[in-house]
Amino acid sequence: MKKDFHFPSQSVSFKCASCSNSFTIESTLKQKEITIDICGKCHPFYIGELTKQTVHGRAEKLSGKFNAGKAFLENKTPKKAKGKTEEYTKHRSLNEL
């Protein structure tokens, strides 16, 4: 058998940044302590509390813009017709042309 074939293992402490929970496991990592973002004790999936995200997708953004435009058009006052007389708006038959 070859000597020094496996990496040396040591006890490494992992510490959660959000809940300060720490646990120690055997690992081949060279660092003695590693900070992780979230662990199983504070992760929403593992504790059973799923939080609703406030990030909206493309469809919600588009519908928000559409509703804002609709509200703007409802509050807008209609413009008067510029100089159109009854003669131009009246439909003519082919005989009149």
Curated annotation (Swiss-Prot):
One of its GO terms (cellular component) is ribosome. The keyword Transcription regulation does not apply. One of its GO terms (molecular function) is rRNA binding. Residues 76-97 are annotated as: Disordered. It holds the Pfam family Ribosomal_L31. One of its GO terms (biological process) is translation. PROSITE patterns: RIBOSOMAL_L31. It comes from the Bacteria. Disulfide bonds: none annotated. Residues 83-97 have a biased composition (Basic and acidic residues). InterPro entries: Ribosomal_bL28/bL31-like_sf, Ribosomal_bL31, Ribosomal_bL31_A, Ribosomal_bL31_sf. Keywords: Ribonucleoprotein, Ribosomal protein, RNA-binding, rRNA-binding. Belongs to the bacterial ribosomal protein bL31 family. Type A subfamily. Part of the 50S ribosomal subunit. PANTHER family: 50S RIBOSOMAL PROTEIN L31, CHLOROPLASTIC, LARGE RIBOSOMAL SUBUNIT PROTEIN BL31C. Binds the 23S rRNA. This is Large ribosomal subunit protein bL31. It comes from Mycoplasma pneumoniae (strain ATCC 29342 / M129 / Subtype 1).
